[in-house]
Amino acid sequence: MARRPLVMGNWKLNGSKAFTKELIEGLKAELHDVTGCDVAIAPPVMYLGTAEAALSGCGCNCGGKSVIQLGAQNVDINVKGAFTGDISTEMLKDFGAKYIIIGHSERRTYHKESDEFVAKKFGALKEAGLVPVLCIGESEAENEAGKTEEVCARQIDAVINALGVEAFNGAVIAYEPIWAIGTGKSATPAQAQAVHAFIRGHIAAKSQAVAEQVIIQYGGSVNDANAAELFTQPDIDGALVGGASLKAPAFAVIVKAAAAAKN
């Protein structure tokens, strides 16, 4: 089946109110006529309100609804209560966020988030009607030891074991080899395709229908120079973009490359 690509910008710990407004104005100008590719941005949660306001009334022929959708970089498993500093699914929905990143290697590393905890976040998002963007991927040591497939399977199975394979209906997986994040290194298109094909095949062993529709993004130092070649691969359905998402022209090139390659 034809899968509609998704290119999502993960701003990480970057930005300000002024930066958020300026970048979104640039993105709206660059992307107002793009079709055939879903686009999302995940600013820091402090700036979701600023981003929501900046995205409204985009000035194109879409009836006031921007082609760019809001996302977020994290969520908690609790809906409310005494959980200082955490953000709930309902809070994210209140700002119009749709695509929520979970399991990013930086969360797994710096905040010690386990596969099982990430799976609970996945379940909380599904219950709230939000779209999980599940990040998976191996470290450099695991890659060199030939454990890429083992690691990816384990991280996917944590969700399947907790929620069933059908939980991946309408969900997104982002393969992000840790050794390629923010390093300037990137898997070759063939290397990335091999892992994406494995991920889809691993899910297909449980359900072919679920595997065929799940969006699998690549997320390792994607930029305006390497995106087009990555998107020629049949199992790469878009990108989770870090540094390049902070510059409107570069991010727009990536979005347009996905739209051109997949349509």
From Swiss-Prot:
PANTHER family: TRIOSEPHOSPHATE ISOMERASE
Transmembrane segments: none
Family listed: Belongs to the triosephosphate isomerase family.
Native species: Haemophilus influenzae (strain PittEE)
Gene Ontology MF annotations: triose-phosphate isomerase activity
Cited function: Involved in the gluconeogenesis. Catalyzes stereospecifically the conversion of dihydroxyacetone phosphate (DHAP) to D-glyceraldehyde-3-phosphate (G3P).
GO biological process: gluconeogenesis; glyceraldehyde-3-phosphate biosynthetic process; glycerol catabolic process; glycolytic process
Gene that this sequence comes from: tpiA
Recorded GO CC terms: cytosol
Lineage summary: Bacteria, Pseudomonadati, Pseudomonadota, Gammaproteobacteria, Pasteurellales
Keywords: Cytoplasm, Gluconeogenesis, Glycolysis, Isomerase
Protein name as annotated: Triosephosphate isomerase
Enzyme class: isomerase
